[in-house]
Amino acid sequence: MSSFLHDSPVLEAPPIPFDNSYARLPPQFFAEQAPTPVAAPRLIKFNSVLASELGLDAEVLERDGAAIFSGNALLPGSQPLAMAYAGHQFGGFVPQLGDGRAILLGEVIDRNGRRRDIQLKGAGPTPFSRRGDGRAALGPVLREYIVSEAMFALGIPTTRALAAVTTGQPVYREEALPGAVFTRVAASHIRVGTFQYFAARGDTDSLRILADYVVDRHYPEIKDRKNRYLALLDAVADRQAALIARWLHVGFIHGVMNTDNMTISGETIDFGPCAFMDAYDPATVFSSIDRQGRYAYANQPAIGQWNLARLGETLLPLIDPTLDTAVELANGIIKAYGERFQTYWLAGMRAKIGLATEEDSDLDLVQSLLAVMQEQEADFTLTFRRLGVLAASVDNEAAFAASFKDPLSVAPWLSLWRERLGRDPQSPAARAKAMLGVNPAFVPRNHRIEQAIAAAVEEDDFSLFEALLAVLAKPYEDQPAFAPYAEPPRPAERVLQTFCGT
């Protein structure tokens, strides 16, 4: 087993008490790379609550955050590096990708004893930059800050936002844009593509080191299993099935589910062209680069399975020395993923429509509601929220029916729903409370994100950004003062495409 996770001796208490296990792995896992300084950094947002959770000195970091989170100042104990990985991008394999604009500063052990990465995105070029400038524009940095923190508040496993800094210098894309650096916190940044990097090189020794490291760090409960590497594939499959089910429960579309954007830890990562669905349509795509709809809303579970199959391929030489046996064992897990996902998804959908018990007909009940929503172009988030309100009192039926173009279209479904509720033991009050706890009032709607970004980029005005963060921190509360944030966009406000950035 790997021994890279032992704690290093700490002689003093720096503002970030680094303990860098990944940097103790062999050199083929990364390239040492310091951030490139920027002209005039300015701290625009610092997550002091997360800093406290991580055991950091929030006071020092807020005071000196511009220099620290831009990469201009390197703290004691940091061992900056760019991680090596490969990946399938829209189905095509690229044997070397790696961190082209991200630099891992190091790791900390948080107050709950969990090891967490701290990474700068947009901190300058690395050996993996592939002719890129290694920089990030302000807009994508704000988008990732907003959406990752919103996902956390929704209760979905995700990377976190620790800080955002403007650089005082432009980045050049189709036009000159203000530059920024994003500080991301993750359980780790190990991806399916990290395994693919070594598999593509036939480097089984490094694969074994990586797999043992991942078991130590993320899945210590399986380290003594008879077939540790098969158990690893199974554990990752379970977390991914649960994660993607949660995405669907809130109408989230990742947008670029390449294997280099799928974490081994089971966290959502890389929010470049992501978006939340307004009107329900399972074929919804927002990403400008997803021209074939590969990563559409309803395709996400199948893509998760496809990505897991790619992970399984890399683990074959570790699972069993006989290839046919290894393939058979791995295939068993990959094939079981669909049923596993369906179990997680249906459990969540039962909760969304207020069911505490299970009946075989529940799937039909859920699917028939979704069919009416699609036909009527009903807003995904608002419809389920209003259903929770309706569960509290029949007086709220008109508001629920108003989610549909033809309010009468949902009446047959409501009759079936009420009949089913009659066989469910919850009281109306308990049911409504439970439903409002899983059906958010607020999600980061695309038009609100774009408004916040436009104000920041064009006017240096971060008030909309701050307001949006405040609303999204309490997604399951009604917040009457912010009721407009719960509404879908007007036709002129609709965002039809999102773009990669960070």
Curated annotation (Swiss-Prot):
Where, in this chain's numbering, is Mg(2+) bound? 261, 270
The UniProt GO MF terms for this protein read:
AMPylase activity; ATP binding; magnesium ion binding
Question: What's one Pfam family here?
Answer: SelO
Give the keywords, sorted: ATP-binding, Magnesium, Manganese, Metal-binding, Nucleotide-binding, Nucleotidyltransferase, Transferase
Q: What is its EC number?
A: 2.7.7.-, 2.7.7.108
State the needed cofactors, names only: Mg(2+); Mn(2+)
Q: Which reactions fall under this protein's catalytic activity?
A: L-seryl-[protein] + ATP = 3-O-(5'-adenylyl)-L-seryl-[protein] + diphosphate; L-threonyl-[protein] + ATP = 3-O-(5'-adenylyl)-L-threonyl-[protein] + diphosphate; L-tyrosyl-[protein] + ATP = O-(5'-adenylyl)-L-tyrosyl-[protein] + diphosphate; L-histidyl-[protein] + UTP = N(tele)-(5'-uridylyl)-L-histidyl-[protein] + diphosphate
Q: What does this protein do?
A: Nucleotidyltransferase involved in the post-translational modification of proteins. It can catalyze the addition of adenosine monophosphate (AMP) or uridine monophosphate (UMP) to a protein, resulting in modifications known as AMPylation and UMPylation.
Protein name as it appears in the record? Protein nucleotidyltransferase YdiU
Gene name per UniProt: ydiU
